Amino acid sequence: MILVTYDVNTVEPGGRRRLRQVAKACQDYGQRVQNSVFEVEVDPARWVALKARLEAIIDPALDSLRYYDLGANWQRRVDHVGAKPAVDLHGPLIL
């Protein structure tokens, strides 16, 4: 599990577009757990692709990305309190 966090400057021109693009890229690979925070479970190849996609979107002079590798036993390292219940990505999907 990788925790992806980002801060995109929306004051400068193009900032809102970059913010939407970063959020969309993260949603394509994981689930939003807070504003600007995503949990992502990917294999190494998909992780390289996501990182490249995100880093191509942001303006490094104005925006930032942070990645936290929580490892394979991430469930034991994450405590959740409050609203927005966690979604079990490995549980059954009911449509």
Swiss-Prot record:
Keyword Nuclease set for record: yes
Domain of life: Bacteria
Protein residues bound to Mg(2+): D7
EC number: 3.1.-.-
Keyword Metal-binding: yes
Subunit-level organization: Homodimer, forms a heterotetramer with a Cas1 homodimer.
Function statement: CRISPR (clustered regularly interspaced short palindromic repeat), is an adaptive immune system that provides protection against mobile genetic elements (viruses, transposable elements and conjugative plasmids). CRISPR clusters contain sequences complementary to antecedent mobile elements and target invading nucleic acids. CRISPR clusters are transcribed and processed into CRISPR RNA (crRNA). Functions as a ssRNA-specific endoribonuclease. Involved in the integration of spacer DNA into the CRISPR cassette.
A Pfam family it matches: CRISPR_Cas2
Lineage: Bacteria, Pseudomonadati, Pseudomonadota, Alphaproteobacteria, Rhodospirillales
Gene Ontology molecular function, alphabetical: metal ion binding; RNA endonuclease activity
Cofactors (names): Mg(2+)
HAMAP family associated with the record: Cas2
Listed InterPro entries: CRISPR_associated_Cas2, Virulence_VapD/CRISPR_Cas2
Family the UniProt entry places it in: Belongs to the CRISPR-associated endoribonuclease Cas2 protein family.
Biological-process GO terms, alphabetical: defense response to virus; maintenance of CRISPR repeat elements
Protein name from the UniProt record: CRISPR-associated endoribonuclease Cas2 3
Keywords: Antiviral defense, Endonuclease, Hydrolase, Magnesium, Metal-binding, Nuclease
Broad class of enzyme this protein falls into: hydrolase
